[in-house]
Amino acid sequence: MGLNRFMRAMMVVFITANCITINPDIIFAATDSEDSSLNTDEWEEEKTEEQPSEVNTGPRYETAREVSSRDIKELEKSNKVRNTNKADLIAMLKEKAEKGPNINNNNSEQTENAAINEEASGADRPAIQVERRHPGLPSDSAAEIKKRRKAIASSDSELESLTYPDKPTKVNKKKVAKESVADASESDLDSSMQSADESSPQPLKANQQPFFPKVFKKIKDAGKWVRDKIDENPEVKKAIVDKSAGLIDQLLTKKKSEEVNASDFPPPPTDEELRLALPETPMLLGFNAPATSEPSSFEFPPPPTDEELRLALPETPMLLGFNAPATSEPSSFEFPPPPTEDELEIIRETASSLDSSFTRGDLASLRNAINRHSQNFSDFPPIPTEEELNGRGGRPTSEEFSSLNSGDFTDDENSETTEEEIDRLADLRDRGTGKHSRNAGFLPLNPFASSPVPSLSPKVSKISAPALISDITKKTPFKNPSQPLNVFNKKTTTKTVTKKPTPVKTAPKLAELPATKPQETVLRENKTPFIEKQAETNKQSINMPSLPVIQKEATESDKEEMKPQTEEKMVEESESANNANGKNRSAGIEEGKLIAKSAEDEKAKEEPGNHTTLILAMLAIGVFSLGAFIKIIQLRKNN
């Protein structure tokens, strides 16, 4: 057990080591190139560079402030402006915008001027929005639009806000708030309608792109359209609000809920409604139920009278070929009177004619068929023959049964007798077979004979002799002689006694017993003892089979002669029993030794196998762990 546990633990360690070191290239990403080396500083730099990137869910437009700051940085880089004030730079850009658009200037300068004018107007609208809204307009119309915006920016307050963009005034704040609220929906719609090609959005990562942008765009447009429609129709908006408020009040008010629940269930019906709803009472046994004076929906009709039952029941059929006489007082539960003598004569004539129509073959075939069907039932009597039907036949009486020869009973070794069969035989001896035929359900009367037939007796079944002996001894008990012999012992009865005892004289104690005639015993091979003839059941005793009949009490001399024989038999039996027990014990000891030896052999065979598997597992673990260690050292050197 200890080796098995150790082996399991080593296997667990081996599996975990394989899971860690089976492919170290995946974990450490070991390559020979310098670019892919394990430098943690480079990874941190990449992370810091990726952090400022923002998620771009659509086209992004630069504000005027961002455009102006970007233009100033570009001018400083190009060495055009050095050590200048921000206010002077803005004034210079404003003067360029007042002179009008210059076609020779590049697109970047035009966008810069437009962004400055947009900032002067005080609104956070995109600088390139006009050109994007109307891409087909000529440059002259775009210049006119710019001039209009420039005229709006001529107020002193706007110039102050332009000079100090970081500190806007209160008037500027209010104006910007109003314009931003007014143009919020328009700017959102315009920004969603712009294409990705015209804008310059920042590149997004693959894992940060929006999911189904077209679907989200359509949902947003639909929501905006619904909101606009509701704002245009205040009546619809008011109706929606009122409806929702009414539903909430109806759900939260307890009184309203109780009224709704009460309205769902109708009131219970009254007795009159139930009586009208129930169908009429159906006809019972062919007559209508009488109408009650006080109708009720849960009342049963009264029971019928004798006259109603007599009229409802059919007429009494013919019984045994004659009609029942009409009685003066009709009753539904009255049997017909017994037949008269004339009717009995008619029955006998018809029975004799029917009896003559039957043949022997018909009765034999009928008896065979019934025997085949009733062979599974031991208590069912066999079909009687023609002689038994016409009269008593070969049914034995109690005296004939007692005087039967022992050879008439067939006795086999496998035959068994139950208590029911013994009781049946006793009844046959005393009272005949009437009780048996009644229990079996056989009809004692014969409809085909002119006179009643007595009860029929079944054929005597096979029965063992000892059971019948015990039954007869119950009826006529007798005293057994006091001798040490065991008469019914199976071991002693199998051996034949060669020495015959001498006849003894009658003792005075057994003088009252009836005198019996000694008879010769007969031995049969492979069969149990049989019964000898009985002349009269109350006057004759039973002779024991295969043993001498002892009619008198044994004297002391006889007892002394019988003692050696019994002692020899008992010694032989004890010796044979001891020999058998000794053999059984020795056989059991040998079997136990063989089982122990086989278990030791199997254990010895299993031990080398366990050792070999353990050694192989440990070798495999060592090889894999060594390889993993070498690989880790190489990776550390490369880093």
UniProtKB/Swiss-Prot annotation:
It is a single-pass membrane protein. Residues 190-210 have a biased composition (Polar residues). Residues 41-52, 409-422 have a biased composition (Acidic residues). It holds the Pfam family ActA. InterPro entries: Virulence_actor_ActA. This is Actin assembly-inducing protein. Its main location: membrane. Residues 450-459, 490-509 have a biased composition (Low complexity). The chain crosses the membrane at residues 613-633. Sequence repeats lie at residues 264-298, 299-333, 334-378, 379-417, 418-422. Virulence factor required for host cell microfilament interaction. It induces actin assembly around the bacteria to allow it to move within the cytoplasm. It is involved in the actin polymerization process. It seems to act as a nucleator that induces the reorganization of the actin cytoskeleton. Residues 36-71, 132-212, 285-308, 320-341, 372-459, 474-610 are annotated as: Disordered. Residues 264-333 are annotated as: 5 X approximate tandem repeats, Pro-rich. It is found in: Cell membrane. Residues 1-29 form the signal peptide. GO terms for cellular component: plasma membrane. Keywords: Cell membrane, Membrane, Repeat, Signal, Transmembrane, Transmembrane helix, Virulence. A motif (Cell attachment site) lies at residues 360-362. Residues 62-71, 423-433, 553-572, 588-609 have a biased composition (Basic and acidic residues). The gene is actA. The lineage of its organism: Bacteria, Bacillati, Bacillota, Bacilli, Bacillales. It comes from the Bacteria.
